[in-house]
A protein has these predicted regions:
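Beta1/beta-strand and adjacent pyrophosphate-binding region of the FAD-binding site
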Residues: 2-12
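Conserved hydrophobic helix-helix packing surfaces used for dimerization/oligomerization
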Residues: 6-8, 29, 245
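Active-site substrate-recognition segment that forms the wall
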Residues: 14-25, 34, 42, 47, ...
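Conserved dinucleotide-binding and phosphotransfer motif residues
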Residues: 25-27, 159-160
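Dinucleotide-binding Rossmann-like beta1-alpha1 core, especially the glycine-rich loop
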Residues: 47-127, 131-132
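Predominantly flavin-linked oxidoreductase catalytic cores and closely associated redox partners
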Residues: 139-233
């Protein structure tokens, strides 16, 4: 019988950070994850963009969020002897007059994050992009190496016997008054971090969830500067793995798989 404070289902970004913070507070955890080849976390671009939407609004509480995010990624990286976060400006190319005017408005308002680009930067972009409206620069912005983060944290959990590599069976879960029982595991609490898989579990199957799907293209773009990220409307381009680029994402409400 294994006894822990918290049973965590799923080791994506959410499950990884919840287990990290709980362990830092001295709690004992067991993470159950069957390591699917594809998941929302594993295919995420890792871009942190401080502005959003057609009107290029500054994200609510972004200064506090950026401080927390950068500090946390650096702390986890230090613990695991890895670097998970890098600062990379975003060149945003307005695809429409509406987006162009929205960006110009933010610059005139002296928005903290949106700036004009230099002639040299404009010439650099023209080597790979065709554009009618002048691009702007979003800074600071950040890129997270999500794949490295997940694999490194998985190794850490395995090292300290905090990971069970298996599929979670909801039917084997028993909720007692003072504990959680799952197979040969007793826990004080259970936290579900396995995304879409929870939708079919009894407690939540009747809730009005909206399931969405995004697809991204992984492409080789020789000559494109990996020191930056790029954006045009809803399309983002970010450095990926092995000299490739992540291009996406679609946003689908109806799909078969």
């Amino acid at each position: 019988m294994k006894q822990v404070d918290y049973l965590i289902i799923g080791q994506g970004i959410s499950g990884s950070f919840i287990s990290y913070f709980l362990l830092e507070k001295g709690a004992s955890v067991l993470v159950i994850d069957h390591s699917p080849e594809y998941s929302a976390s594993k295919v995420a671009s890792g871009m942190i963009n401080p502005v959003t939407g057609r009107i290029v609004a500054t994200t609510w509480m972004i200064h506090e969020l950026l401080d927390f995010a950068t500090d946390t990624y650096y702390e986890v990286g230090k613990k695991l002897n890895e670097n998970f976060i890098s600062e990379k400006h975003i060149f945003t190319i307005p695809p429409t007059l509406q987006m162009h005017e929205a960006l110009e408005k933010r610059v005139s308002e002296k928005n903290t994050f949106i700036k004009n680009i230099s002639n040299a930067e404009s010439d650099l972009l023209k080597e790979n992009f065709h554009f009618y409206f002048q691009p702007k620069k979003i800074q600071p912005a950040f890129l997270i190496n999500v794949q490295l983060l997940l694999s490194s944290w998985k190794n850490y959990l395995e090292k300290f016997d905090c990971l069970e590599k298996s599929s979670f069976d909801f039917n084997a879960l028993s909720l007692k008054k003072d504990r959680i029982e799952y197979k040969n595991i007793h826990a004080r609490k259970i936290i579900f971090c396995n995304g879409i898989e929870t939708f079919n579990y009894t407690p939540w199957k009747n809730l009005p969830y909206t399931i969405t799907k995004g697809e991204a293209l992984i492409a080789s773009i020789p000559g494109l500067d990996e020191n930056f990220m790029y954006k045009s409307g809803s399309l983002s381009i970010a450095p990926w793995q092995n000299d490739t680029w992540w291009i996406g994402s679609s946003f689908e409400h109806q799909f078969q798989d």
